[in-house]
Amino acid sequence: MLDSLLAIGGLVLLRDSVEWEGRSLLKALIKKSALRGEQVHVLGCEVSEEEFREGFDSDVNSRLVYHDLFRDPLNWSKPGEAVPEGPLKALRSMCKRTDHGSVTIALDSLSWLLCHIPCVTLCQALHALSQQNGDPGDNSLVEQVRVLGLLHEELHGPGSMGALNTLAHTEVTLSGKVDQTSASILCRRPQQRATYQTWWFSVLPDFSLTLHEGLPLRSELHPDHHTTQVDPTAHLTFNLHLSKKEREARDSLTLPFQFSSEKQKALLHPVPSRTTGHIFYEPDAFDDVDPEDPDDDLDI
């Protein structure tokens, strides 16, 4: 499960709730990235650095760069700055990293950032973070950037949620029952169809996962060859094919704007000596023609 979430770059959105917290899964993904040799940047907003690093071993902590916004979110400790930028400055500084190889950026949390940064500005910063691609001749840029964003979805309206969902390459929605947590994963890969899966897991104290089962949410992702195929034409309200009598009846019909032989002859072989126009009128079957009063059917 962790490997599938970390397989591609871009924004990975972890949506939790009051009942099912997502920080444990976030730290499990951070541990997995660090053990793969990646540099991990953490923008900590909701808990202290000591609390966040608790539970990680020395190998993981050595690869973890913590940007602390918990103690001084608005840069009040630096009175020399005329306009403290706070969290926005931290995000912009992370956009200018010079690390080599793949980099994982963890935002704890996006909900806190949404409370201090306008949604449009935050989305622009997230797009800049997740879309960094290095040039072949530039060794200072990273190969792949992965942004892990923890989002408390109950705190936000549909506008902010919709904007972040549009940016995300992978969406993880946490729920569950009793002591087991489920993660419903929507993964969008470039030039491929989106995939839906759900996993049941438990997070251990060392932030490793114990998987219980994986169930696809949509059966068409893994089709069962033993299931009966439904005929899509079985319950139509119209006929796809005509019988012989129906075809003959269709061919014998006169189209509404089909020219008669007299009109065709007059149009194709005009009389040279005729200088005045000629009006052809072919009444329909339902026309009420009254020679004495031709305007009788007009609603005046």
From Swiss-Prot:
Keywords for the protein's UniProt record, in alphabetical order: Cytoplasm, Nucleus, Phosphoprotein, tRNA processing
Cell compartments where the protein resides: Nucleus; Cytoplasm
Protein's GO biological process: positive regulation of cell migration; tRNA wobble uridine modification
Cellular component terms per the entry's GO annotation: cytoplasm; cytosol; elongator holoenzyme complex; nucleoplasm; nucleus
Presence of the UniProt keyword Acyltransferase in the record: no
Subunit and partners: Component of the elongator complex which consists of ELP1, ELP2, ELP3, ELP4, ELP5 and ELP6; in the complex, is required for optimal binding of ELP3 to ELP4.
PANTHER family hit by this protein: ELONGATOR COMPLEX PROTEIN 5
Family: Belongs to the ELP5 family.
Protein name: Elongator complex protein 5
Organism whose genome encodes this protein: Mus musculus
Gene responsible for this protein: Elp5
